[in-house]
UniProtKB/Swiss-Prot annotation:
It is found in: Cytoplasm, Cytoskeleton. Interacts with KIF1B; positively regulates KIF1B microtubule motor activity. Interacts with STMN2. It comes from the Eukaryota. Keywords: Cytoplasm, Cytoskeleton, Developmental protein, Differentiation, Hirschsprung disease, Neurogenesis, Phosphoprotein. Its main location: cytoplasm. Gene3D superfamilies: Tetratricopeptide repeat domain. This is KIF-binding protein. Highly expressed in heart, brain, ovary, testis, spinal cord and all specific brain regions examined. Moderate expressed at intermediate level in all other adult tissues examined, as well as in fetal liver and brain. Not expressed in blood leukocytes. Transmembrane segments: none annotated. The modification Phosphoserine is found at S178. GO terms for cellular component: cytoskeleton; mitochondrion. The keyword Phosphoprotein applies. Residues 54-65 have a biased composition (Acidic residues).
Amino acid sequence: MANVPWAEVCEKFQAALALSRVELHKNPEKEPYKSKYSARALLEEVKALLGPAPEDEDERPEAEDGPGAGDHALGLPAEVVEPEGPVAQRAVRLAVIEFHLGVNHIDTEELSAGEEHLVKCLRLLRRYRLSHDCISLCIQAQNNLGILWSEREEIETAQAYLESSEALYNQYMKEVGSPPLDPTERFLPEEEKLTEQERSKRFEKVYTHNLYYLAQVYQHLEMFEKAAHYCHSTLKRQLEHNAYHPIEWAINAATLSQFYINKLCFMEARHCLSAANVIFGQTGKISATEDTPEAEGEVPELYHQRKGEIARCWIKYCLTLMQNAQLSMQDNIGELDLDKQSELRALRKKELDEEESIRKKAVQFGTGELCDAISAVEEKVSYLRPLDFEEARELFLLGQHYVFEAKEFFQIDGYVTDHIEVVQDHSALFKVLAFFETDMERRCKMHKRRIAMLEPLTVDLNPQYYLLVNRQIQFEIAHAYYDMMDLKVAIADRLRDPDSHIVKKINNLNKSALKYYQLFLDSLRDPNKVFPEHIGEDVLRPAMLAKFRVARLYGKIITADPKKELENLATSLEHYKFIVDYCEKHPEAAQEIEVELELSKEMVSLLPTKMERFRTKMALT
């Protein structure tokens, strides 16, 4: 190296970095890694010019550097040791080169070689990893090894590297605290060294990446609480350091909302979704960064897709909040329990007094104007369970707004499954809104809207390719007709003398419900059209419910023909008996339909007597 000016070595290194940043699509189609290979060649030249690694660092067995190798590898160092003297300085510069070679090989899908270089980097830094000069490089190397092992699906190994990085960061901030040297500064002239502010920004970004990768690892390990905590920390830090991609940040915040929704933490979910809306609105207003080299305006399809995905998260929020309220207020037959409603009203003030101040501190994104913008979105949406129709309607309208927004991208032509799920959510919004409605005619109209949006899907779908989805839709349409029939019967019961139009309407609804329940049950038959002796666990409850409702529907058909009525009662009895007999042969099924089974047993006992009386009456007339 004595014969080569240091400035030339630095130029080679900077040229290698520039080539490393060239995007793949800018390379020739047949040589997508051309720039990466050119960068690698320059890095190897710099490595050769630096000379061999210090002997005691280079000769140590690699096994010592693996995860779990004790204090000298991933454990925390006992003290801060700065790399002083020419030998130590050369070791650190070589570590920088090994790091970039490692990343280069990973980028070209040569994982084993990439791992080897990253492990060499860590070995060279072993003594100095907590120092001002080396901490950032050490954490970056371990982060990349964490990603590498994660890609190999060795998640526990990835976890060890990433948790070690987190611990190193925390120890450094506690014991040293000053912004550390960025690895690239090893090859910069003194006058081009970074400011303290820029160093701090880069180091905090490295740590933010560490938290982001840990969130992914914990999610993979099904440690969902931890994953949510790290995801939230990542998102918060990205905003604090103004280092985020609006579309990516927004979709991550919306995804985090789903964790809170499943935990029934609706205030936190609302905050995440409101923040997602605000940040997503920045798309195109923020210039590209080194992390996001292309302006977002160049990816309109991704923009519209993410917008649709965020809309779907809002739909889930509205739907789950309404359904949770329904569960809290319904009686044992699924109707509104006024006593429960009154109890929840009494709790409302207490909820407002206690939760607003406590929980708002737990999840909060942004400060100043950003915080105000997020709050402005939040204030338009309730996080409390709706207790009456007006409150439920507000959530319904918000959910429906996002249904229309989601359907703009997720159209049936190209996104069949997604489109159907959005339509099913729309139907579910109408269904749960009907629970809060006291006017039975208006409830009927809501179920009619559900049928109007679901029935066309059964025409568009090929049952051979979309069997499960078809079953879901058939069952849901049947249930909507079933609910409408029950409501029409209740309306007729209030009249002294129902006219023929109402009777015809009830029978038509009955017939439609039977049609779709039968289509659902027929879909369970084998290719020889034989109904299974053992019904699969995934469809057991819906199959039993369908049988029970078919039995009940036959018993509800209104006819003036005694012979036809007797036939209907016999068919009804046949379906009730099926349920009882099946549960006797398969006791596990009884747990799925306890209420329906008891009613079926009762009907199996009562119907034969009723039918016998009917026969006697027919004989006498």
